[in-house]
Amino acid sequence: MAGNNPTSSEYIQHHLQNMTFGLHPENGLGLAHSAQEAQEMGFWAIHLDTMGWSIGLGVLFLWLFRSVAKSVSTGVPGGLQNFVEMMVEFVDNSVRETFHGKSKLIAPLSLTIFCWIFLMNLMDLVPVDFLPMLAQKIGAWFGADPAHVYFKVVPTTDVNATLGMSLAVFALIIFYSIRSKGLSGFLAELTLHPFNASNPFVQALLIPVNFLLEAVTLLAKPVSLALRLFGNLYAGELIFILIAMIGLWQLPLHFAWATFHILIITLQAFIFMMLTIVYLSMATEKH
């Protein structure tokens, strides 16, 4: 931690700080030793813990589903095969009910989004001190100061991760809009709606207003996707940290909050997936 006996503020700040690698203007290339150093590294700094856990959990998801696909049987399926089939059927039904286009990419994309975000959210149930303390001990073996070893284990509590996923969805929204309506149709949607007039001069005057409203609506989609997921998981992680600080009573409270938090973990993954499907369905609709 920030010391042998950290204050409550230091304890919280330490748990909410990412392991940041980047180019510091004074210290050169390396790991940040404080939140201020991480900030001074600027935009191109990398959160190693977020990258590591998100990629690792993504690989775990791919390996798990590939293993089930390779060992699938037509007889009595095992528990894991039942679970995977249930997940695939659930997501497929959600896509069929919500997406009205013809793309075959949406169902596997939705399955990937739901499972990947669910696994990242699930890391919030790991005891808050376990992996950070393990990282500190490993850092000490390599000669690092344990007080300056930061390690966050929930990728979705990092706004950079949630914003990165939402920007990928935003890029797909633009792609499907242009593919479905053409570039001219996409631009017309941005400039000729919601207000229109039969008089060409009046319509020309309305173009900036329409563009401003439609641009705000379009940009609000990835921002709301990112901040909703980040805010809910960040708040959940903060509550776990606060519970860990109260001593003897932390175990029953931790269990109670973890039980409730399972609903949040699942619900937020589902909401992100469903909104992605809805946005992509809207992008393919022609007005």
Swiss-Prot record:
Pfam families: ATP-synt_A. GO terms for biological process: proton motive force-driven plasma membrane ATP synthesis. The chain crosses the membrane at residues 45-65, 106-126, 158-178, 238-258, 260-280. One of its GO terms (cellular component) is plasma membrane. InterPro entries: ATP_syn_F0_a_bact/chloroplast (IPR045082), ATP_synth_F0_asu (IPR000568), ATP_synth_F0_asu_AS (IPR023011), F0_ATP_A_sf (IPR035908). Its main location: membrane. Keywords: ATP synthesis, Cell inner membrane, Cell membrane, CF(0), Hydrogen ion transport, Ion transport, Membrane, Transmembrane, Transmembrane helix, Transport. It is found in: Cell inner membrane. It is a multi-pass membrane protein. GO terms for molecular function: proton-transporting ATP synthase activity, rotational mechanism. HAMAP family: ATP_synth_a_bact. PANTHER family: ATP SYNTHASE SUBUNIT A, CHLOROPLASTIC (PTHR42823:SF3). Belongs to the ATPase A chain family. Key component of the proton channel; it plays a direct role in the translocation of protons across the membrane. F-type ATPases have 2 components, CF(1) - the catalytic core - and CF(0) - the membrane proton channel. CF(1) has five subunits: alpha(3), beta(3), gamma(1), delta(1), epsilon(1). CF(0) has three main subunits: a(1), b(2) and c(9-12). The alpha and beta chains form an alternating ring which encloses part of the gamma chain. CF(1) is attached to CF(0) by a central stalk formed by the gamma and epsilon chains, while a peripheral stalk is formed by the delta and b chains. This is ATP synthase subunit a. It comes from Chromohalobacter salexigens (strain ATCC BAA-138 / DSM 3043 / CIP 106854 / NCIMB 13768 / 1H11).
